[in-house]
């Protein structure tokens, strides 16, 4: 009990610190400039590229990647296990994950179950732990996504991927444990069929869903978590109890990237498909006005907020809060992003200026794993690993 009390105290102290830091230098700063091309202390390095051959049987598609990344996946899976065992020292939870979870969850749709089995066999990690690693992203993703349209009608779609809140804090170097362990697992993926690109994405090795990607010439898509009382935990419980009529959000995102052929088709699927967890889908197209944030409950859409440059709406910004509500006072990334966009102006939109915005604290924070930049029309896709050196807010 003492260990849990100390953990609670640390989390409360972190929350108070972040609440104070959200609106005070040096944890916030004026809009950054000249950070692109990426360099300096906020740049960890490039994200490596791998090809996923969709012509291969699902079981074999990830083998080459996982031979490279398997050792790093074992590190993060062991960190998850250690955190669980801290709360349940008997080890029974992880025993259930290893022995019971695959049967509890039953079959997954499409190729995903066979892909996870292949990953488990190559890495020699129990299938239950690979499944739990994939489930994890349904519950703990915090991000900032932006779509912009310039005066010529050209669209850009960018995002910071923030992940790992409350999942272990390293007091020696002031970093989130899981966030840091995800960086070596971050990969750019070129999904190909008949040796031609179907879509590109940035993801984590071992995860078969998608959170960030684009279909060249057609549309771009990012997924942000949406917190709700009717949330992912309830959807997961329903799935375990046998109600399997909803889609995993990472899987539906991948399915849309792989199979949808237009912005409108993608928007229709994302707006209407029943989901296991609430979410924000940030979708960009290839022509003027094609950009929106789809705010989803599990069963239906609450709101579709679209670009409307004729009415002065030349950007959309989505973090992890409904646009009609104020962000949580200790986690306001929306206001700094909007402020920097307005200062940038519609005339000066580019990968460089948008990377500057995503490099400005607290949009950039201790949870930020990578920054992705997407230009659908020009088939230009970039992703970079990030750091946020002290002083930097925890989220």
Swiss-Prot record:
EC number(s) stated in the UniProt entry for this protein: 3.5.1.23
Glycosylation sites: 173, 259, 286, 348
Biological process terms in GO annotation: fatty acid metabolic process; sphingolipid metabolic process
Annotated catalysed reactions: an N-acylsphing-4-enine + H2O = sphing-4-enine + a fatty acid; N-dodecanoylsphing-4-enine + H2O = dodecanoate + sphing-4-enine; N-tetradecanoylsphing-4-enine + H2O = tetradecanoate + sphing-4-enine; N-hexadecanoylsphing-4-enine + H2O = sphing-4-enine + hexadecanoate
Keywords: Disulfide bond, Glycoprotein, Hydrolase, Lipid metabolism, Lysosome, Secreted, Signal, Sphingolipid metabolism, Zymogen
UniProt signal peptide: 1-21
Active site feature: 143
Site location (Important for catalytic activity): 162, 320, 333
Post-translational modification comment from the UniProt entry: N-glycosylated.
Pfam families given in the database record: CBAH, NAAA-beta
GO cellular component: extracellular region; lysosome; membrane
Record flagged with keyword Ribonucleoprotein: no
InterPro entries the UniProt entry points to: Acid_ceramidase-like, Acid_ceramidase_N, CBAH/NAAA_C
CDD domains referenced in this protein's UniProt entry, alphabetically: Ntn_AC_NAAA
Annotated GO MF terms: fatty acid amide hydrolase activity; N-acylsphingosine amidohydrolase activity
Pathway in which the depicted protein is active: Lipid metabolism; sphingolipid metabolism
UniProt keyword Signal, yes or no: yes
Predominant cellular place of this UniProt entry's protein: other
Locations listed in the record: Lysosome; Secreted
Family designation: Belongs to the acid ceramidase family.
PANTHER family in the cross-refs: ACID AMIDASE (PTHR28583), ACID CERAMIDASE (PTHR28583:SF1)
Subunit annotation: Heterodimer; disulfide-linked. The heterodimer is composed of the disulfide-linked alpha and beta chains produced by autocatalytic cleavage of the precursor.
Function: Lysosomal ceramidase that hydrolyzes sphingolipid ceramides into sphingosine and free fatty acids at acidic pH. Ceramides, sphingosine, and its phosphorylated form sphingosine-1-phosphate are bioactive lipids that mediate cellular signaling pathways regulating several biological processes including cell proliferation, apoptosis and differentiation. Has a higher catalytic efficiency towards C12-ceramides versus other ceramides. Also catalyzes the reverse reaction allowing the synthesis of ceramides from fatty acids and sphingosine.
Protein name: Acid ceramidase
Naturally occurring in which organism (per UniProt): Heterocephalus glaber
Gene transcribed to yield this protein: ASAH1
């Amino acid at each position: 009990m003492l260990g849990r009390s100390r953990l609670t105290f640390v989390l409360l102290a972190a929350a108070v610190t972040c609440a104070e830091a959200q609106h005070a230098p040096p944890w916030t700063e004026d809009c950054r400039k000249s950070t692109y091309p990426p360099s300096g202390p906020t740049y960890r390095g490039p994200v490596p590229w791998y090809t996923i051959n969709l012509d291969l049987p699902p079981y074999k598609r990830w083998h080459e990647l996982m031979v490279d990344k398997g050792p790093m996946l074992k590190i993060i899976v062991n960190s998850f296990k250690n955190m669980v065992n801290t709360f349940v020292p008997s080890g029974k939870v992880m025993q259930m994950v290893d022995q019971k979870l695959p049967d509890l969850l039953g079959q997954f749709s499409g190729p995903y179950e066979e892909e996870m089995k292949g990953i488990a066999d190559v890495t020699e990690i129990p299938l239950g732990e690979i499944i739990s690693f994939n489930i994890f992203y349904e519950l703990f993703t915090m991000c900032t996504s932006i779509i912009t349209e310039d005066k010529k009608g050209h669209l850009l779609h960018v995002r910071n991927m923030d992940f790992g809140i409350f999942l272990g804090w390293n007091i020696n170097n002031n970093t989130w444990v899981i966030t840091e362990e995800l960086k070596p697992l971050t990969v750019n993926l070129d999904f190909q069929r008949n040796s031609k690109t179907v879509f590109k994405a940035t993801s984590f090795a071992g995860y078969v869903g998608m959170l960030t990607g684009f279909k060249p010439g057609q549309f771009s898509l990012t997924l942000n978590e949406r917190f709700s009382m009717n949330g992912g935990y309830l959807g997961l419980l329903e799935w375990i109890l046998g109600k399997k009529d909803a889609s995993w959000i990472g899987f539906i995102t991948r399915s849309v990237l792989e199979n949808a052929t237009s912005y409108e088709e993608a928007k229709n699927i994302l707006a209407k498909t029943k989901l296991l967890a609430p979410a924000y889908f940030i979708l960009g197209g290839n022509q003027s006005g094609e950009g929106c944030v789809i705010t989803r409950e599990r069963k239906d859409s609450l709101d579709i907020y679209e670009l409307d440059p004729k009415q002065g709406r030349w950007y959309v910004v989505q973090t992890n809060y409904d646009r009609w509500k104020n962000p949580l006072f200790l986690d306001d990334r929306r206001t700094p992003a909007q402020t920097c966009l307005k200062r940038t102006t519609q005339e000066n939109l580019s990968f460089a200026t948008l990377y500057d915005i995503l490099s400005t604290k607290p949009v950039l924070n201790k949870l930020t794993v990578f920054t992705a930049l997407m230009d659908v029309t020009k088939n230009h896709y970039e992703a970079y690993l990030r750091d946020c050196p002290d002083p930097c807010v925890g989220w």
